Protein backbone atom coordinates (compact mmCIF):
# COMPACT_ATOMS: atom_id res chain seq x y z
CA UNK A 1 0.00 0.00 0.00
CA UNK A 2 2.87 2.33 0.82
CA UNK A 3 4.45 1.74 -2.58
CA UNK A 4 1.13 2.26 -4.33
CA UNK A 5 0.61 5.56 -2.51
CA UNK A 6 4.08 6.74 -3.51
CA UNK A 7 3.47 5.82 -7.13
CA UNK A 8 0.11 7.61 -7.09
CA UNK A 9 1.75 10.79 -5.81
CA UNK A 10 4.36 10.71 -8.56
CA UNK A 11 1.74 9.98 -11.21
CA UNK A 12 -0.37 12.90 -10.04
CA UNK A 13 2.62 15.22 -10.17
CA UNK A 14 3.60 14.13 -13.66
CA UNK A 15 0.01 14.47 -14.81
CA UNK A 16 -0.02 18.10 -13.69
CA UNK A 17 3.14 18.71 -15.72
CA UNK A 18 1.55 17.17 -18.79
CA UNK A 19 -1.21 19.79 -18.68
CA UNK A 20 1.29 22.59 -19.37
CA UNK A 21 0.86 22.76 -23.14
CA UNK A 22 -0.56 25.03 -25.82
CA UNK A 23 -1.81 24.88 -29.39
CA UNK A 24 -1.26 27.50 -32.06
CA UNK A 25 -4.68 28.40 -33.49
CA UNK A 26 -3.76 31.06 -36.08
CA UNK A 27 -1.78 31.40 -38.24
CA UNK A 28 -1.78 27.70 -39.07
CA UNK A 29 0.93 25.70 -37.33
CA UNK A 30 3.76 23.94 -39.14
CA UNK A 31 2.90 20.24 -38.95
CA UNK A 32 0.53 18.27 -36.75
CA UNK A 33 0.25 19.03 -33.04
CA UNK A 34 1.98 16.51 -30.77
CA UNK A 35 2.03 17.62 -27.12
CA UNK A 36 5.23 15.76 -26.21
CA UNK A 37 7.10 17.31 -29.15
CA UNK A 38 6.49 20.92 -28.14
CA UNK A 39 9.74 20.94 -26.16
CA UNK A 40 11.64 20.87 -29.46
CA UNK A 41 12.36 23.58 -32.04
CA UNK A 42 9.13 24.34 -33.93
CA UNK A 43 7.39 21.49 -32.12
CA UNK A 44 9.77 18.99 -33.77
CA UNK A 45 8.75 20.13 -37.27
CA UNK A 46 12.04 21.33 -38.74
CA UNK A 47 10.95 21.47 -42.36
CA UNK A 48 9.13 24.53 -43.68
CA UNK A 49 5.64 23.82 -44.95
CA UNK A 50 4.76 24.54 -48.57
CA UNK A 51 1.27 25.59 -47.52
CA UNK A 52 2.07 28.99 -46.04
CA UNK A 53 -0.55 31.24 -44.46
CA UNK A 54 -1.05 34.69 -46.01
CA UNK A 55 -0.43 37.23 -43.24
CA UNK A 56 -1.50 40.88 -43.59
CA UNK A 57 0.77 43.90 -43.29
CA UNK A 58 -2.10 46.36 -42.77
CA UNK A 59 -2.41 45.80 -39.01
CA UNK A 60 -5.34 43.38 -39.11
CA UNK A 61 -3.24 40.30 -38.34
CA UNK A 62 -2.96 38.44 -35.05
CA UNK A 63 -1.51 35.37 -33.37
CA UNK A 64 -3.90 33.17 -31.41
CA UNK A 65 -3.12 30.25 -29.10
CA UNK A 66 -5.07 27.96 -26.81
CA UNK A 67 -3.45 27.15 -23.48
CA UNK A 68 -4.32 24.29 -21.18
CA UNK A 69 -2.34 25.78 -18.31
CA UNK A 70 -2.17 29.01 -16.33
CA UNK A 71 -0.40 31.19 -15.53
CA UNK A 72 2.13 31.19 -18.35
CA UNK A 73 4.48 33.44 -20.28
CA UNK A 74 4.19 33.70 -24.06
CA UNK A 75 5.80 35.67 -26.86
CA UNK A 76 7.07 35.11 -30.39
CA UNK A 77 10.25 35.35 -32.41
CA UNK A 78 10.48 35.72 -36.18
CA UNK A 79 12.72 34.64 -39.05
CA UNK A 80 12.71 35.98 -42.59
CA UNK A 81 14.72 33.04 -43.90
CA UNK A 82 12.89 31.11 -46.61
CA UNK A 83 13.86 27.81 -44.98
CA UNK A 84 13.87 28.61 -41.27
CA UNK A 85 15.00 25.32 -39.73
CA UNK A 86 17.42 26.31 -36.94
CA UNK A 87 17.61 28.65 -33.95
CA UNK A 88 20.20 30.78 -35.76
CA UNK A 89 17.57 31.74 -38.32
CA UNK A 90 15.65 33.58 -35.59
CA UNK A 91 18.59 35.71 -34.42
CA UNK A 92 19.17 39.38 -35.16
CA UNK A 93 22.49 40.92 -36.22
CA UNK A 94 23.54 41.18 -32.56
CA UNK A 95 22.95 37.50 -31.91
CA UNK A 96 19.81 37.98 -29.83
CA UNK A 97 16.36 36.64 -30.56
CA UNK A 98 14.49 38.62 -33.22
CA UNK A 99 11.37 39.46 -31.24
CA UNK A 100 8.05 39.61 -33.06
CA UNK A 101 5.71 39.75 -30.05
CA UNK A 102 6.98 40.91 -26.66
CA UNK A 103 6.81 38.34 -23.87
CA UNK A 104 3.90 38.71 -21.49
CA UNK A 105 2.40 36.82 -18.57
CA UNK A 106 -1.15 35.53 -18.97
CA UNK A 107 -3.08 34.49 -15.88
CA UNK A 108 -5.88 32.44 -17.47
CA UNK A 109 -6.05 29.25 -19.50
CA UNK A 110 -8.10 29.06 -22.68
CA UNK A 111 -7.78 31.13 -25.85
CA UNK A 112 -5.35 34.05 -25.91
CA UNK A 113 -4.99 36.31 -28.95
CA UNK A 114 -2.47 39.07 -29.65
CA UNK A 115 -2.88 41.60 -32.49
CA UNK A 116 0.32 41.56 -34.56
CA UNK A 117 1.43 44.05 -37.20
CA UNK A 118 4.74 42.91 -38.77
CA UNK A 119 5.18 46.32 -40.43
CA UNK A 120 5.73 47.89 -37.00
CA UNK A 121 8.84 45.77 -36.33
CA UNK A 122 11.09 47.83 -38.62
CA UNK A 123 12.90 44.68 -39.75
CA UNK A 124 14.45 44.79 -43.21
CA UNK A 125 12.77 42.44 -45.65
CA UNK A 126 9.25 42.61 -44.26
CA UNK A 127 7.26 43.46 -47.38
CA UNK A 128 4.52 42.17 -49.62
CA UNK A 129 5.37 38.70 -50.92
CA UNK A 130 8.14 37.98 -48.39
CA UNK A 131 8.18 34.63 -46.63
CA UNK A 132 8.68 34.38 -42.88
CA UNK A 133 8.31 32.01 -39.95
CA UNK A 134 6.77 33.02 -36.63
CA UNK A 135 7.80 30.84 -33.69
CA UNK A 136 5.65 31.09 -30.57
CA UNK A 137 7.61 30.55 -27.34
CA UNK A 138 5.57 29.48 -24.31
CA UNK A 139 6.48 28.49 -20.77
CA UNK A 140 4.09 27.40 -18.06
CA UNK A 141 6.82 27.40 -15.42
CA UNK A 142 8.32 24.01 -16.22
CA UNK A 143 10.23 24.74 -19.43
CA UNK A 144 9.84 26.18 -22.91
CA UNK A 145 7.39 24.91 -25.51
CA UNK A 146 7.46 25.89 -29.19
CA UNK A 147 5.26 25.97 -32.28
CA UNK A 148 5.92 27.59 -35.66
CA UNK A 149 3.79 29.14 -38.37
CA UNK A 150 5.13 29.62 -41.89
CA UNK A 151 3.61 32.72 -43.50
CA UNK A 152 3.79 34.90 -46.58
CA UNK A 153 3.29 38.62 -46.01
CA UNK A 154 0.58 40.34 -48.03
CA UNK A 155 -0.42 44.00 -48.14
CA UNK A 156 -3.94 42.90 -47.30
CA UNK A 157 -5.60 39.52 -46.84
CA UNK A 158 -9.16 39.11 -48.09
CA UNK A 159 -11.71 37.38 -45.89
CA UNK A 160 -9.57 37.58 -42.76
CA UNK A 161 -11.98 38.04 -39.88
CA UNK A 162 -9.97 39.84 -37.22
CA UNK A 163 -13.03 39.85 -34.94
CA UNK A 164 -12.21 36.24 -34.03
CA UNK A 165 -9.19 37.57 -32.14
CA UNK A 166 -10.78 37.27 -28.71
CA UNK A 167 -9.74 35.95 -25.32
CA UNK A 168 -11.46 33.49 -23.03
CA UNK A 169 -10.82 31.84 -19.69
CA UNK A 170 -11.09 28.41 -18.16
CA UNK A 171 -10.66 24.92 -19.54
CA UNK A 172 -13.80 25.13 -21.71
CA UNK A 173 -13.13 28.28 -23.67
CA UNK A 174 -16.14 28.11 -25.98
CA UNK A 175 -18.52 30.09 -23.82
CA UNK A 176 -16.53 32.13 -21.30
CA UNK A 177 -15.71 35.51 -22.78
CA UNK A 178 -13.24 37.67 -20.93
CA UNK A 179 -11.07 40.76 -21.14
CA UNK A 180 -7.92 38.79 -20.44
CA UNK A 181 -4.79 40.89 -20.84
CA UNK A 182 -1.13 40.03 -20.70
CA UNK A 183 1.61 42.01 -19.03
CA UNK A 184 4.45 42.75 -21.44
CA UNK A 185 6.94 43.08 -18.59
CA UNK A 186 7.64 39.34 -18.47
CA UNK A 187 11.24 38.37 -19.13
CA UNK A 188 12.08 36.45 -22.28
CA UNK A 189 12.76 32.72 -21.89
CA UNK A 190 16.09 31.46 -23.19
CA UNK A 191 15.83 29.72 -26.57
CA UNK A 192 19.48 28.73 -26.87
CA UNK A 193 19.63 25.51 -24.87
CA UNK A 194 18.70 21.90 -25.45
CA UNK A 195 14.95 21.62 -25.00
CA UNK A 196 14.85 18.10 -23.57
CA UNK A 197 17.77 18.29 -21.16
CA UNK A 198 17.31 16.24 -18.00
CA UNK A 199 16.56 18.34 -14.96
CA UNK A 200 18.81 17.86 -11.89
CA UNK A 201 17.02 16.34 -8.93
CA UNK A 202 17.75 19.34 -6.71
CA UNK A 203 16.17 21.69 -9.27
CA UNK A 204 13.23 19.36 -9.64
CA UNK A 205 12.80 19.77 -5.89
CA UNK A 206 12.35 23.51 -6.39
CA UNK A 207 9.25 22.85 -8.46
CA UNK A 208 7.81 20.02 -6.33
CA UNK A 209 9.13 20.47 -2.77
CA UNK A 210 6.43 18.38 -1.10
CA UNK A 211 7.02 15.39 -3.35
CA UNK A 212 10.78 15.83 -3.20
CA UNK A 213 10.71 15.74 0.61
CA UNK A 214 8.60 12.60 0.50
CA UNK A 215 11.02 10.87 -1.85
CA UNK A 216 13.99 11.77 0.32
CA UNK A 217 12.45 10.18 3.41
CA UNK A 218 10.57 7.38 1.66
CA UNK A 219 12.01 3.85 1.62
CA UNK A 220 10.89 3.60 -2.00
CA UNK A 221 14.22 4.92 -3.32
CA UNK A 222 13.69 3.53 -6.80
CA UNK A 223 11.23 6.33 -7.49
CA UNK A 224 14.03 8.87 -7.23
CA UNK A 225 15.99 6.94 -9.83
CA UNK A 226 12.95 6.90 -12.09
CA UNK A 227 12.52 10.65 -11.84
CA UNK A 228 16.20 11.29 -12.50
CA UNK A 229 15.99 9.31 -15.72
CA UNK A 230 13.13 11.36 -17.14
CA UNK A 231 13.95 14.00 -19.79
CA UNK A 232 12.34 17.11 -18.35
CA UNK A 233 12.20 20.47 -20.14
CA UNK A 234 13.58 23.09 -17.81
CA UNK A 235 15.77 25.14 -20.10
CA UNK A 236 13.83 28.34 -19.39
CA UNK A 237 15.30 28.51 -15.89
CA UNK A 238 18.91 27.46 -16.52
Curated annotation (Swiss-Prot):
Keywords: Cell membrane, Copper, Disulfide bond, Glycoprotein, GPI-anchor, Lipoprotein, Membrane, Methylation, Secreted, Signal. It comes from the Eukaryota. The keyword Lipid metabolism does not apply. It is found in: Secreted; Cell membrane. Residues 197-238 form a propeptide. Residues 1-20 form the signal peptide. Binds 1 copper ion per subunit. Residues 168-191 are annotated as: Disordered. Its main location: secreted. Glycans are attached at residues 47, 51, 92, 131, 161, 167. The modification Methylhistidine is found at residue 21. It comes from Waitea arvalis (Laetisaria arvalis). CDD domains: LPMO_auxiliary-like. The keyword Membrane applies. Its cofactor is Cu(2+). Pfam families: BIM1-like_dom. Disulfide bonds join 42-148, 113-165. Lytic polysaccharide monooxygenase-like protein that has diverged to biological functions other than polysaccharide degradation since it does not perform oxidative cleavage of polysaccharides. Acts as a cell surface-bound protein that functions in the copper-accumulation pathway. May also act as the major cell wall sensor that regulates MAP kinase-dependent hyphal anastomosis, the fusion of hyphal cells. A lipid is attached at residue 196 (GPI-anchor amidated asparagine). InterPro entries: BIM1-like (IPR046936), BIM1-like_dom (IPR046530). This is Lytic polysaccharide monooxygenase-like protein X325.
Amino acid sequence: MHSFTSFALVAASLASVAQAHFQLQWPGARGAFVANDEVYFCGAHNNVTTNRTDFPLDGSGFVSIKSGHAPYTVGAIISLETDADAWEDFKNSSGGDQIAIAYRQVDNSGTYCVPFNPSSLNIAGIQDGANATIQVVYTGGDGNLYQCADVTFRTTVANLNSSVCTNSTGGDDHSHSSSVTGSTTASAPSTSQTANAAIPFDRWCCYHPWLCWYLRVSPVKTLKGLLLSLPYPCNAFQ
